[in-house]
Structures are given as C-alpha cells and as structure tokens.
Amino acid sequence: MTRLTLALDVMGGDFGPSVTVPAALQALNSNSQLTLLLVGDPDTITPLLAKADFEQRSRLQIIPAQSVIASDARPSQAIRASRGSSMRVALELVKEGRAEACVSAGNTGALMGLAKLLLKPLEGIERPALMTVLPHQQKGKTVVLDLGANVDCDSTMLVQFAVMGSVMAEEVIGITNPRVALLNIGEEETKGLDSIRDASALLKTVPSINYIGYLEANELLTGKTDVLVCDGFTGNVTLKTMEGVVRMFLSLLKSQGESKKRSWWLLLLKRWLQKSLTRRFSHLNPDQYNGACLLGLRGTVIKSHGAANQRAFAVAIEQAVQAVQRQVPQRIAARLESVYPAGFELLEGGKNGHSRVHN
C-alpha cells in the first residue's frame, strides 16, 4: 500500500474538532500509510492531540484556518466569504496537490460550490453528485446518488449520474456489469417526472449501462439494483428517512422495556433475542456507511454527515482512502469518453423537463 495524504476540515459539522480530531487519530491507528492534514484553529486542535503518540504525531500536521463556514449559511454567501475558511483551505490543499482528497462534515451546499469552483468538474459532467453505498437485505451493497448536491436535475444529469454510479459499483464494490435503476413513483413507463422518463429513454440507448428500469423507494434495501439514480432532493429525503427508521429499529432492539416483573428465564430469552437481532441487523447501522463521495470532480471530496460521531467520521476518512486508491475520478473520466460517443446529448429544454408529474 502506497502512502497517501488527506486534508480534513476538522472544524466542520455539528460537533467540530471534538469529534473530527479523535476520528483522525482513530484513522491513523487503522492505517499506517496515512498522513492527515488537520485544517482549522490550532488552539482548538492541539489540546485534542494530547493522547496521540509520537508515531501518530509524525503523520499529522495542523494547517491553520481563520474561520469556519456555518452549517446554516447560504451557499452563495458562504462561497463569497470563504477565503481563509477551514473548508476552502482543505480543498485548496487538494487543488495544490498537497493532499489527495478532502473530507468535510460542513455545509453541503458550500462544499459542493467550492469543490466545483476549485477542483473543476470532469469533462462531460454538468454538475457533481453526492454518492454513498448502502447495505441491502441480501448482504450486498447499492450505490445511491444524488443525495443532495443537486435539488433539481434534468435528464442528462441523471444519465451522467448513472455513468458515475456504474463506475463506483464496478471499481469500489467489485460488481461486474452493475444493474442501474431510476428511483420513481412507479415501475410503469408512463410514471414520474418528464426528466426521469427522458433519462430512462436515454439510458436504454447506452450499451455500456445495464439499465433495468424504475425502482420504487420501498425496494431501496431489497438488492434489486446495484446503482440507484435520483435527483438530490429525492435522494436526500430518502436517505434520511431510511437512516431514521434504521436508528429507531436498532434502538428498540437495545431497549430493555418492561422487564422487572418478568421471570428470570424470560429475561434471559429476551436478552439473547436482542443480541441476536442486533448482530443480524447491525450492518444497517448508518454510522457504518457515513461519507458521501462528491463524484464528477477532478479530485476526491468526501462529505460526512454533519451529525457524525467519532466512529462515523472515521468511516468517512476510510471512504476517502478507498476512493483515492481506486482512482475514482480517473476511472469515471475514462468511462465518460467511452459513453459519450454512444450518442446522448443535452436535450433541448432539458432544464425545464421536470415540471410535470405523471401518476
């Protein structure tokens, strides 16, 4: 394994350095080839490194930043006032070649805008998309995008997402000829927004994409598709709804409930069932798949959930390591070169092709 360097915006997220710095130390402990650039306020970061040993400190460097982009700031305003912010400095380290990827739990809109401004989209990509890998009930994984980078998407953008998602499924998960589906309100050809139906027609003409049609949200975790494509609004709502349900389910499994009046053997049986079910469904825990990759850029950017805990942010760092090692941007660029000659172009009026819904 070759050495690699990541830039961490340690000031971003709901909890800032109190979570991101311990997560950085955890990541260093798990990967001896990793070097981390901690971008933020040195006075806040330094005390949190007290438990780091000499070997870990040799693979750490604090990069000062003057400010933090607020999580509730409007993206346009945040970008204009971003100079010297921890997020922008971390991205600039990637642009300058000092780091191979950036990880941030900060403002999603600002991260998207700054990454596009500084790192530039790949040739043939209109706008980058946020992608994550979710577990399903067949104990496999599904690539899902967009998860919030683009609230409104035309048909061409959805096709581009399908191309990028296919590359991720092949290169990161190792799926040969991955199945691709569009998230829709029904499986019938006439259902959904014009943009979705137009994207469906386009995907049928691309030989390098194994397009299987529409998928409804209730089948997200069934394993019926390897890549699920949707606009950022739908994807974000779907993901957060799923995370909330899974967290509630796992919490119910762990709760003790009314146990005081039960006999000892019923208590033992209940605890055994709780442990068994928790083990059975623990792979659905959202913390285990934290970290959405911003696909379609000339560099690697990972967006962590803003409310991520230490374990979850460490997972996001590992996602960045995997993306760099798999050379995701380069592989997407190569696939785009092979796909575009297949004959899809920006549809006339595509930007306005998503205003009508067919039920």
From Swiss-Prot:
Family annotation (InterPro entries): FA_synthesis (IPR003664), Phospholipid_synth_PlsX-like (IPR012281)
Recorded GO MF terms: phosphate:acyl-[acyl carrier protein] acyltransferase activity
GO cellular component, one term: cytoplasm
Stored PANTHER family: FATTY ACID/PHOSPHOLIPID SYNTHESIS PROTEIN PLSX, PHOSPHATE ACYLTRANSFERASE
Protein name: Phosphate acyltransferase
Subunit text: Homodimer. Probably interacts with PlsY.
Gene3D superfamilies: Isopropylmalate Dehydrogenase
Task of the protein: Catalyzes the reversible formation of acyl-phosphate (acyl-PO(4)) from acyl-[acyl-carrier-protein] (acyl-ACP). This enzyme utilizes acyl-ACP as fatty acyl donor, but not acyl-CoA.
Assigned keywords, A-Z: Cytoplasm, Lipid biosynthesis, Lipid metabolism, Phospholipid biosynthesis, Phospholipid metabolism, Transferase
Gene Ontology BP, a term: phospholipid biosynthetic process
Coiled coil: none
Protein family membership: Belongs to the PlsX family.
Pathway: Lipid metabolism; phospholipid metabolism
UniProt enzyme class: transferase
EC number(s) reported in the record: 2.3.1.274
Organism from which the protein derives: Citrobacter koseri (strain ATCC BAA-895 / CDC 4225-83 / SGSC4696)
Location relative to the cell: Cytoplasm
Keyword Endoplasmic reticulum: no
Catalysed conversion reaction: a fatty acyl-[ACP] + phosphate = an acyl phosphate + holo-[ACP]
Primary localization class, coarse: cytoplasm
